Design a protein with these regions (language model features):
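Active-site mouth loops of central-metabolism enzymes
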Residues: 50-68, 120-130
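Conserved helix-loop functional segments at active or binding sites
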Residues: 58, 69-82, 88, 108-115
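Active-site-adjacent beta->alpha loops and helix N-cap segments on the catalytic face
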Residues: 92-105, 153-161
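Catalytic cores of alpha/beta
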Residues: 127-141
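Alpha-helix-loop-beta-strand connector modules within alpha/beta enzyme cores
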Residues: 95-121, 174-181, 185
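Conserved, mostly hydrophobic/aromatic
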Residues: 87, 106, 137, 194
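Short, ordered loop/turn segments at secondary-structure junctions
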Residues: 88-90, 126, 142, 149-152
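Flexible, glycine-rich loop/tail regions that form catalytic "lids" or insertion modules at the edges
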Residues: 1-61, 73-75, 80-82, 133-134, ...
Length: 295
């Protein structure tokens, strides 16, 4: 909900919804949504929410601008205090805007319009599957996250064991608990002990994104090496989207993307020793040439 001046006390300033974790399970998300849903008996206009799709057909940058303009209008004119960014409208014709770009771009536009204190941002995304991904969204302005794909993966993985309803609920809570622990570990390395203090801190080093994207979405974050532009990212999205929908009902090997630990003699990883050493050497030489990071 809205954040007011802490030096000016009024009863209505206490009207805030509190969650015990930034990672929402479905039940908690449904409760949160019900407070701002005009069709719900729980509805209170102070918690008015609106869902915005974060999918697009073409032109990533223009789609981000359009999304931000809709959000700003809803907050400024319609009194929306909870903005929900949802990528579940993904389909064969609709591609998903990367969650970090959507959250970061909307967050920065709200800041520039002087409206950020009036709204909380909730992300419904399939991209968050580990503590780092969650920390990125929180660090760039997200208040809470409903990682539906992560919980769906937990259900699918353990379904073969035919757990009871109680056991499945416990497994889902353990999944949430593990991500919470990871977020706490990330925050503690920066000497931060509360999510409220970590939110919108931008305490990340950015490698491989153009200055335009950093300025638009991740203002204030430290960027070592420039790289991908909006058009480059859109090309990657198009490729992934094509691979996902190229043939209906077909199953393909899971592409892990090279984010996990390098093992000598094991599978190739994007972030292996050769790549990281090249980045370190390039930074030490104070030279930047995008061609060194292509391919």
């Amino acid at each position: 909900g809205r954040v007011h001046n802490i030096l000016d006390e009024k009863p209505e300033y206490a009207k805030r919804l509190k969650v015990t974790s930034p990672i929402l399970m479905k039940e908690k998300y449904d409760i949160l949504y019900s407070f701002g849903d005009e069709k719900s008996p729980r509805y209170d206009e102070y918690y008015k929410n609106r869902v915005f799709s974060t999918t697009f057909k073409s032109n990533l940058k223009a789609s981000l601008e359009k999304l931000a303009s809709y959000v700003i209008k809803a907050v400024d004119k319609d009194g929306v205090s909870v903005v929900i960014l949802d990528d579940r409208t993904l389909s064969e014709n609709e591609k998903a805007i990367p969650a970090a770009l959507a959250v970061g771009y909307v967050n920065q536009k709200l800041l520039k319009e002087g409206l950020r204190h009036s709204v909380s941002i909730v992300a419904i995304t399939g991209e968050v599957y580990d503590p780092h991904m969650a920390a990125v969204l929180i660090g760039f302005g997200c208040t809470a996250i409903y990682p539906y794909m992560m919980f769906a993966s937990t259900v699918a993985f353990f379904q073969r064991e035919k757990p009871s309803k109680y056991e499945m609920q416990k497994l889902l809570k353990n999944t949430q608990k593990s991500v919470n622990a990871g977020i706490l570990k990330i925050m503690s390395k920066m000497g931060i002990c509360t999510v409220a203090s970590y939110r919108n801190s931008g305490l990340f080093d950015i490698i491989g994104l153009s200055d335009e994207i950093v300025n638009d979405c991740f203002t204030g974050a430290h960027s070592d090496l420039a790289g991908l532009t909006y058009s480059d990212i859109e090309a990657k999205i198009n490729k992934s989207h094509h691979n996902a929908f190229v043939e209906e009902n077909s199953m393909f090997p899971l592409d892990l993307g090279g984010f996990y630990k390098y093992s000598n003699g094991g599978e190739y990883h994007d972030y292996g020793p050769a790549t990281t050493n090249a980045m370190h050497n390039k930074k030490a030489a104070k030279k930047e040439d995008i061609t060194d990071f292509e391919g």
